């Protein structure tokens, strides 16, 4: 029997489980979305020789979802205050400044600005 290929860092985004309903046809379960692939990529950029457990990955995924939720709700509130029906990059930037502390907010704003500039120039 050949040895199993090393899946040291290969995290699956989601499992597709097949269940048989009453009508006899196979039905796939919905895929669970997560940021695990992207968290893993960042981890490998910062610490190439470090792994992460599934429990730690679940915690990181919850953390990312929580931060995005906070930014989105703050941006929504800002748009509502200013009688705007659209959340623009300006609302997101202000929300990030309000939510994240000090130096972290500065770095997040500069990285966000860089990403938006890169996106608009590639269009």
Curated annotation (Swiss-Prot):
Core component of nucleosome. Nucleosomes wrap and compact DNA into chromatin, limiting DNA accessibility to the cellular machineries which require DNA as a template. Histones thereby play a central role in transcription regulation, DNA repair, DNA replication and chromosomal stability. DNA accessibility is regulated via a complex set of post-translational modifications of histones, also called histone code, and nucleosome remodeling. Coiled coil: none annotated. It is found in: Nucleus; Chromosome. GO terms for cellular component: nucleosome; nucleus. The nucleosome is a histone octamer containing two molecules each of H2A, H2B, H3 and H4 assembled in one H3-H4 heterotetramer and two H2A-H2B heterodimers. The octamer wraps approximately 147 bp of DNA. The keyword Secreted does not apply. One of its GO terms (biological process) is innate immune response. SUPFAM superfamilies: Histone-fold (SSF47113). GO terms for molecular function: DNA binding; protein heterodimerization activity; protein-containing complex binding; structural constituent of chromatin. Belongs to the histone H2B family. Monoubiquitination of Lys-118 gives a specific tag for epigenetic transcriptional activation and is also prerequisite for histone H3 'Lys-4' and 'Lys-79' methylation. GlcNAcylation at Ser-110 promotes monoubiquitination of Lys-118. It fluctuates in response to extracellular glucose, and associates with transcribed genes. The lineage of its organism: Eukaryota, Metazoa, Ecdysozoa, Nematoda, Chromadorea. This is Probable histone H2B 4. Residues 1-30 are annotated as: Disordered. Glycans are attached at residue 110. It holds the Pfam family Histone. Keywords: Chromosome, DNA-binding, Glycoprotein, Isopeptide bond, Nucleosome core, Nucleus, Ubl conjugation. There is a cross-link at residue 118 (Glycyl lysine isopeptide (Lys-Gly) (interchain with G-Cter in ubiquitin)).
């Amino acid at each position: 029997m050949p040895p199993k290929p090393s899946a040291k860092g290969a995290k699956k985004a989601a499992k597709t489980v097949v269940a048989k309903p009453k009508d006899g046809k196979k039905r796939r379960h919905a895929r669970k979305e997560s940021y695990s692939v992207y968290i893993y990529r960042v981890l490998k950029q910062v610490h190439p020789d470090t792994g992460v457990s599934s429990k730690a990955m679940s915690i990181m995924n919850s953390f990312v979802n929580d931060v995005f939720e906070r930014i989105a709700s703050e941006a929504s509130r800002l748009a509502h205050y200013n009688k705007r029906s659209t959340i623009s990059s300006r609302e997101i930037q202000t929300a990030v400044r309000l939510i994240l502390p000090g130096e972290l907010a500065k770095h997040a704003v500069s990285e966000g600005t860089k990403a938006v500039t890169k996106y608009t120039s590639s269009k």
